[in-house]
């Protein structure tokens, strides 16, 4: 998950407590006891009190947490505190970097039985693997794509952003990386490494007559959509669920033929983890369908990597309707960007924004 998206997600998740949770797939005391230390964003799934309590009661394994406030801080903690952590939550883009620095150990998937139904499109992502070995259990995912007002024609391409029919009715996410990815898809290029930035720039500039708003927060998006300032927008999959469920807005999330711009968070075991066995048990717990249904319906959660978990949601659940497994086949997953490429992307977006303002 991007840092901005994750922060907004966690702010909007409630602190609901669910009693009496039962996870039948994990037998009592099935794994070695002890304590595991989890490194994660605060309030992001692994530290739900009801879940930790149920896990400890089933396994005898206590769970403590340490938190980071940025992905760079997460990597620094792994580098400078060997032996301090047993499980780390990290984005696919950062996982590749951690593997390159030998900060993670290979996952023994035989000890994560719930991973058998993790979507292969996620499990085989090159950011999570090296030399045929997996270094993280894919956990949750989401994407940026198109959101439209219900009742309007459903678009099949990002080219709709430049359609004259939407003159003055489009909202764009004020994020350089996302917009360059959109421009790359509009010009038939790779979202992480578009070779022709001039074509990306031209594609984004073609949207100018339609751009009504550059939004930066979910709250701003909701208020502007409710005020009917726009009808078509780039938006987050999870945001569209919350807007429809919590704010009762008539929004429909659409993934065009070019695919969504995706992120995936995984569960990794640090190379120096003192209790890897316990960490694997907890990773298995985190992708358990029973845990996920409780987290998603009682608290609010991104899409599970486990297709069995998504399928366990009620058929009318908005998250299940938005995060369809078939979207993973075309979803491009954002990778870590070298500094020079990130700077180039920022320069493209600054040029485009200046053009919009003329």
What label would you give each PLM region?
Residues 1-20:
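N-terminal secretory signal peptides and thylakoid transit peptides that target proteins
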Residues 94-97, 226, 232-249:
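A ligand-binding cleft/hinge motif common to bilobed small-molecule-binding domains
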């Amino acid at each position: 998950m991007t840092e901005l998206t994750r922060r907004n997600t966690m702010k909007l998740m409630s602190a609901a407590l669910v009693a009496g949770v039962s996870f039948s797939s994990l037998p009592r005391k099935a794994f070695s006891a002890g304590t595991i230390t989890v490194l994660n964003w605060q309030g992001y799934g692994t530290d739900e009190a009801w879940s930790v309590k149920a896990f400890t009661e089933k396994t005898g394994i206590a769970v403590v947490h340490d938190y980071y406030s940025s992905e760079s801080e997460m990597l620094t903690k792994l580098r400078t505190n060997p032996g301090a952590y047993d499980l780390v939550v990290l984005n696919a883009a950062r996982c590749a970097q951690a593997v390159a620095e030998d900060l993670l150990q290979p996952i023994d998937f035989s000890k994560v039985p719930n991973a058998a139904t993790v979507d292969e499109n996620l499990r085989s992502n090159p950011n999570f693997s090296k030399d045929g070995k997996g270094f993280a259990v894919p956990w949750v995912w989401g994407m940026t794509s198109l959101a439209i007002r219900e009742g309007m024609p459903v678009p099949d391409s990002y080219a709709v952003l430049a359609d004259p029919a939407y003159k003055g009715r489009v909202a764009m996410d004020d994020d350089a990386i996302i917009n360059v990815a959109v421009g790359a898809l509009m010009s038939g290029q790779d979202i992480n490494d578009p070779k022709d930035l001039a074509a990306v720039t031209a594609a984004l500039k073609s949207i100018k007559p339609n751009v009504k708003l550059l939004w930066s927060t979910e709250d701003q998006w909701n208020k502007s959509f409710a005020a009917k300032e726009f009808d078509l927008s780039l938006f987050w999959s999870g945001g569209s669920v919350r807007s429809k469920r919590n704010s009762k807005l008539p929004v429909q999330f659409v993934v065009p033929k070019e695919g969504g711009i995706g992120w995936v968070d995984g569960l990794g075991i640090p190379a120096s983890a003192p209790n890897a066995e316990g960490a694997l048990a907890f990773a298995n717990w985190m992708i358990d369908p029973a845990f996920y249904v409780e987290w998603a319906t009682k608290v609010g959660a991104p899409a599970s990597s486990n297709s069995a978990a998504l399928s366990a949601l009620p058929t009318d659940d908005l998250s299940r309707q938005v995060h369809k497994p078939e979207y993973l086949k075309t979803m491009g997953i954002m990778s870590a960007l070298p500094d020079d490429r990130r700077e180039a992307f920022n320069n493209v977006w600054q040029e485009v924004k200046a053009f919009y303002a003329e």
